[in-house]
């Protein structure tokens, strides 16, 4: 049993070493990670397989492979439900935020389902002690895309009333607020909001 564990551990570590090569394209890194996941799954190492899948989602995000990201994350959520002893829900939430954002971009996913995924994300962040800031941020971004400026304003107000925490991305929010002010013709507001970015106060 120990020898078997050592063998697959070394096989996975060898693949991970290859992913450290900065000249690799994200697609090549993704393929190496998929092979590592296959080995972890074969050996029923759920904890490691989950870590590897979260890394894979990062590479798939760079490739804009939305549908594939969603499939990978669905597997992570299934594994979490069956292995709450080894997988911490909190570790999944940042990537869940990405996944929910992906669902808006896929026309084959009906809006009802997108909303249901958003509600599930909302439930999970609340029970892990996070504010709803990231939830409202996502909806405000999508309303701008849909040119629903009044609705976007409602979500922005709600977002700004929630506390900033580890699920928030201040630079993303600032970037988005600039888009909102520019889209709605509030150029003075956009200019004053842009100062921290111009002065490199927010990265």
Q: Residue locations for each model-derived region?
A:
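C-terminal non-catalytic interaction modules
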Residues: 1-6, 12
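Solenoid-like repeat scaffolds
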Residues: 3, 38-45, 77-86, 120-130, ...
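Residues within HEAT/ARM-like alpha-solenoid scaffolds
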Residues: 7-10, 24-31, 44-52, 68-71, ...
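Non-membrane alpha-helical segments in proteins
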Residues: 10-22, 35-36, 47-65, 91-105, ...
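Helix-turn-helix repeat elements of alpha-solenoid scaffolds
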Residues: 22-35, 62-79, 106-120, 144-158, ...
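A general structural signal for short secondary-structure boundary/capping elements
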Residues: 82, 99-104, 164, 185-187
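Extended alpha-helical scaffolds
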Residues: 127, 131-153, 157-171, 179, ...
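Alpha-solenoid helical repeat scaffolds
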Residues: 171, 175-176, 185-188, 199-203
